[in-house]
Each structure stands twice: as structure tokens, then as C-alpha cells.
Amino acid sequence: MNINATLIGQTVAFIIFVWFCMKYVWPPLMNAIEERQKRIADGLANADRAAKDLELAQAKATEQLKEAKATANEIIESANKRKAQIVEEAKAEADAERARIIAQGKAEIEAERNRVKEELRKQVATLALAGAEKILERSIDAAAHSDIVEKLVAEI
């Protein structure tokens, strides 16, 4: 292998080409590669951050759902207590009304009973007087007297 001027010229041209590439072509390529690596790293970091944010959002949503269910249960329990209270109040009012109506009915019955007794006394007195008149008008005969008394008893 002979070293001649062509080989030296090619070597010098290759060295100049390598130096040119290292000076002007390689830095933009490295910058492009570094930017790409940085974008990929940022994208992965954003994906990790988004995944963590998603987990936090899901945890928060789950917590809010639990709180909403607890609040709903409290509202339902409070409504049930109020319902029971209203039912008890209605029962108490109904019992009081029933007692009042019964007392009023008993009072009316007692008043009617007293009125009937008084009326009966008046009728008995009238019948007794009428019987006494009849006895006095007739002769005091035992048979007639017992007949009148039987009629009076039948009328009473």
C-alpha cells in the first residue's frame, strides 16, 4: 500500500469533514436529542403527576360520596325521628280527644238518666195521686183496692 497524495488528501478531507460535523452538525443534533429527551421526561413526569392527581381526585370523590351518604343517612334518621314524634303527638291528641268525647258522652248519658228519673218520679207521683183518687172515690173494698193497685203496678 502506497501512501500517496490522494490518500493524504482524502485523510485531510475526512478530518475536515469530521471537524465540520463536530463543530456545526453535531451540536444541533445533540440539542435536538436533548430537547426530545427533556420532552419525554417532562411527559412522563406529567403522566405520573396526572396519575397521582387522578388518585387524589378519586379519593376525594370517594370521601365526598361517603360524606354525602352519611349526611343522607342523618337526614333520613332525623326524618324518621320526626315522623315518630308526629305519630306520638297524633296518638296523644287522639287519646285526649277520645277521653274528652267519652267524658262528654258519659255526662250526656248521666244527664239524660237524671232527666228520665225525674220524669219517672213525676209520673209515679201522678199515678200514685191518681190511684189514691180512684181508691178514695170508690168504696174501700179490699178487692177493688187490690184491683186498682195491680193496675197501678202494671202502669208503672
Curated annotation (Swiss-Prot):
Superkingdom as given in the UniProt entry: Bacteria
Gene Ontology terms: cellular component: plasma membrane; proton-transporting ATP synthase complex
Sequence intervals crossing the membrane: 7-29
Main localization category: membrane
Membrane topology designation: Single-pass membrane protein
Keyword terms of this UniProt record: ATP synthesis, Cell inner membrane, Cell membrane, CF(0), Hydrogen ion transport, Ion transport, Membrane, Transmembrane, Transmembrane helix, Transport
Single GO MF annotation: proton-transporting ATP synthase activity, rotational mechanism
Localisation per UniProt entry: Cell inner membrane
Matches recorded under HAMAP family: ATP_synth_b_bprime
Subunit structure of this chain's protein: F-type ATPases have 2 components, F(1) - the catalytic core - and F(0) - the membrane proton channel. F(1) has five subunits: alpha(3), beta(3), gamma(1), delta(1), epsilon(1). F(0) has three main subunits: a(1), b(2) and c(10-14). The alpha and beta chains form an alternating ring which encloses part of the gamma chain. F(1) is attached to F(0) by a central stalk formed by the gamma and epsilon chains, while a peripheral stalk is formed by the delta and b chains.
Function recorded in the entry: F(1)F(0) ATP synthase produces ATP from ADP in the presence of a proton or sodium gradient. F-type ATPases consist of two structural domains, F(1) containing the extramembraneous catalytic core and F(0) containing the membrane proton channel, linked together by a central stalk and a peripheral stalk. During catalysis, ATP synthesis in the catalytic domain of F(1) is coupled via a rotary mechanism of the central stalk subunits to proton translocation.
Family: Belongs to the ATPase B chain family.
Protein name as annotated: ATP synthase subunit b
